[in-house]
């Protein structure tokens, strides 16, 4: 019942937000404050030229972290790192004790120019981190053990060109899609000119299956899948993945060599025309692809694709209702609205305007479903 948050100055904080009776505190209490970048530099023996981007706990309570940003150019050769803070040290600090971080922070040095571009995932097998160049499965074993490292392909940073209906671009240089896990597979997209959904074997890191996605859009649109995909494993051999196009959101300023794409402000990472004109400046595309277990391995097939929707909310699936929940803009009326899609067919089953006025762009804030429904 504590809040764990990375900060823009490379620290990680653990905060107490409620008292012993569950009442929200008027001012959160800071229980832990670690300068991760400084600790990682000490462990690495080098200066890091990337900032802290993401953190996640693994199943043993170790806190994994990765440096990077929303667009990491390999040719700039900035030094980055992935690593973890040992569970025992975190517990000691929370008990009010001193912890020697030189014996509790472990790192894996990345090739200069390599860095994370989104979130980290964790399972009982370890922590999965997707950088702009590779996908890793890592384990904490008194140091960072690289169980496997699988490279993937990217066309590099994508930007709008002549004839495009957008002015922005993609956010990431590489895949940009936070990996999503099943017990047996790691799911993410690459960033080739035709984007592919990849399924990696959790045990070996080998590509078990792949399939092109969002490859039949109207003229004038490119593809960049920048958010964590929805992944649903039905437990009977079928894994369904929902991918959503995000091309057009990225600011042209991300190409500036002096830009720090780890700073997550609207002005820094998002296209000004999307911020001011709305979803007409975002490329459409939402697609469901199923990965099916066969006698010989896995095969993928497209189930449905919506080339008329531009979603900005990071779609959410409710397995209880069988609906996908999103937030879009009606491009005819200009009104922002909630939208519900049928998981099986992709058809729209419900929309509701949030207002009768303009200006309700949710600016990429994710959808959340409470346990009350």
Whereabouts are the PLM-identified features?
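Loop/turn-rich, solvent-exposed surfaces of beta-rich toroidal or solenoidal domains
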Residues: 185-189, 195, 227-358
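Conserved beta-propeller blade signature
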Residues: 2-6, 62-66, 126-130, 185-189, ...
């Amino acid at each position: 019942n504590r809040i764990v948050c990375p900060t823009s100055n490379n620290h990680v904080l653990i905060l107490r937000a409620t008292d012993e009776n569950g009442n929200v505190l008027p001012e959160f209490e800071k229980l832990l404050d670690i300068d991760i970048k400084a600790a990682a530099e000490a462990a690495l023996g080098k200066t890091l030229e990337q900032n802290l981007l993401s953190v996640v706990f693994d199943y043993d309570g170790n806190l994994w972290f990765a440096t990077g940003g929303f667009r990491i150019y390999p040719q700039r050769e900035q030094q980055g790192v992935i690593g973890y803070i040992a569970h025992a040290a975190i517990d000691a600090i929370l008990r009010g004790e001193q912890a020697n971080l030189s014996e509790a922070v472990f790192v894996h040095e990345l090739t200069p120019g390599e860095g994370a571009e989104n979130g980290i995932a964790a399972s009982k097998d370890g922590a999965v981190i997707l950088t702009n160049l590779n996908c890793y499965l890592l384990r904490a074993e008194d140091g960072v053990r690289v169980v496997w490292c699988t490279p993937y392909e990217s066309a590099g940073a994508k930007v709008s060109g002549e004839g495009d209906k957008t002015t922005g671009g993609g956010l990431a240089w590489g895949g940009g899609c936070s990996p999503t896990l099943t017990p047996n597979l790691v799911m993410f997209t690459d960033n080739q000119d035709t984007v592919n959904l990849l399924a990696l074997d959790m045990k070996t890191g080998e590509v078990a299956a792949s399939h092109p996605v969002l490859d039949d859009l109207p003229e004038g649109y490119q593809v960049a899948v920048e958010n964590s995909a929805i992944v649903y494993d039905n437990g009977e051999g079928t894994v369904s993945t929902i991918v959503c196009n995000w091309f057009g959101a990225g600011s042209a300023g991300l190409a500036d060599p002096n830009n720090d794409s780890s700073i997550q402000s609207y002005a820094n990472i998002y296209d000004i025309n999307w911020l001011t004109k709305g979803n007409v400046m975002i490329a459409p595309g939402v697609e469901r692809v199923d990965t099916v277990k066969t006698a010989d391995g896995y095969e993928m097939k497209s189930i449905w694709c919506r080339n008329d929707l531009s979603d900005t909310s990071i779609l959410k699936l409710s397995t209880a209702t069988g609906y996908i929940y999103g937030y879009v803009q009606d491009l005819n009326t200009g009104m922002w609205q909630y939208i519900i899609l049928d998981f099986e067919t992709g058809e729209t089953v419900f929309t509701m305007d949030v207002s009768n006025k303009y200006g309700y762009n949710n600016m990429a804030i994710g959808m959340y479903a409470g346990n009350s429904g």
